Every structure is written in C-alpha cells, then in structure tokens.
Amino acid sequence: MLTIALSKGRILDDTLPLLAEAGIVPTENPDKSRKLIIPTTQEDVRLLIVRATDVPTYVEHGAADLGVAGKDVLMEYTGQGLYEPLDLQIAQCKLMTAGKVGAVEPKGRLRVATKFVNVAKRYYAEQGRQVDIIKLYGSMELAPLIGLADKIIDVVDTGNTLRANGLEPQELIATISSRLVVNKASMKMQHARIQALIDTLRKAVESRHRG
C-alpha cells in the first residue's frame, strides 16, 4: 500500500491533476467527503487528508510514504527523516516580513509576530538582530495594528489582506511553492515504485510549466 498525505485547500486542488497524470484519482471528492482516508482508482494507493502543518510529521514517521507540503511548512519543520525530491511548482506565494505603512523600525529589540517561529529565529539570527518572537496562529495583521508587534512574518499571495489592514510587505524571506516529500525508509523499501511516480510527476510539472 502506498499512502500519500495531502492537505485540503489550494495544495490539494493543484496536486490532484498531477496525480491524475500518474493514474491516481480519488474515488470520491476529498473536498466534499468527511473521510480522512480516501481510496483511489489504484487499489494499492490511498490518500490521507491531514492538516498542512502535519504533512511532514506523517511522512517522517512512516504513517504516509509520500506527501505534498508547502516550502514554508518544510522550512519551519525541524525533522530529519524526509527526502524532498521534487518542486511541484504549485501553490506559489512568498514568505515575507510586513509592517505598518510608513512605520519607523525601532532601533532596539524588534517584536515579531508569526506562526513561523523557527524561520523567524534563523532569519534574524543571520542578520545579527535581536528579536522577541510572539507566536500567533492566525490574524497576524492585527499584531502591528494594536501594538503587539512591530512586524509580522507571514505568507503573502496578492498582498491585498495586508494593504486592507494598513500594512505593507517588506523583506522577502523565501519564494514558496509546494514540494513532494518522501519518507526515507519508504524510498528504500519501495524505490522502483516511488521513483516511477516521481518521474511521472516531474514530467507532468514540466509539461504544465511549458504550457
């Protein structure tokens, strides 16, 4: 059995056409189904529907053989048991700092609100900047507006939400897209099968990119 971990939303919607190129199609619509384990048209392949931030955990610990996760999630993840063989070039966005329009950055310790705590620590350590990191799980834009933080670090797509709240994108930390991740043990045990799937997905990505 080959198990693939996916998260609902944009990543799932963009991944399903790529999997279809490999003949892997869910037997029911994951967006409408309440099931978290979904069979596919290949009897020995199933999909696990999990939270986006949990995809690397399921794959590293062998609960799934493969998964699709955003690079932002992988940058924040601290595990070691993953291969990242393919950039699927889907769900593209940017990981950026943002702050109030026209605000002057304080010279002392910077207060940064984010759910990407590990990314923030690395980013500011590389700059030699002292920061206090405040972990939030959502509504990041509020933090600078009410004085909780000087800046935020978050995923930015169009930037419309930032602008609607009087914020502006500032420094680019990373360009984000979704990646195929593979469990290291699964890659050894089912190498031919998984490598064939990787090759098929790579061709599908290249074909879509050329198109």
Curated annotation (Swiss-Prot):
Transmembrane segments: none annotated. Its EC number is 2.4.2.17. InterPro entries: ATP_PRibTrfase_cat, ATP_PRibTrfase_CS, ATP_PRibTrfase_HisG, ATP_PRibTrfase_HisG_short. GO terms for cellular component: cytoplasm. GO terms for molecular function: ATP binding; ATP phosphoribosyltransferase activity. It comes from the Bacteria. It catalyses: 1-(5-phospho-beta-D-ribosyl)-ATP + diphosphate = 5-phospho-alpha-D-ribose 1-diphosphate + ATP. Pfam families: HisG. Its main location: cytoplasm. Keywords: Amino-acid biosynthesis, ATP-binding, Cytoplasm, Glycosyltransferase, Histidine biosynthesis, Nucleotide-binding, Transferase. Pathway: Amino-acid biosynthesis; L-histidine biosynthesis; L-histidine from 5-phospho-alpha-D-ribose 1-diphosphate: step 1/9. It is found in: Cytoplasm. GO terms for biological process: L-histidine biosynthetic process. Lacks the C-terminal regulatory region which is replaced by HisZ. Heteromultimer composed of HisG and HisZ subunits. Belongs to the ATP phosphoribosyltransferase family. Short subfamily. NCBIfam families: hisG (TIGR00070). Catalyzes the condensation of ATP and 5-phosphoribose 1-diphosphate to form N'-(5'-phosphoribosyl)-ATP (PR-ATP). Has a crucial role in the pathway because the rate of histidine biosynthesis seems to be controlled primarily by regulation of HisG enzymatic activity. This is ATP phosphoribosyltransferase. It comes from Pseudomonas fluorescens (strain Pf0-1).
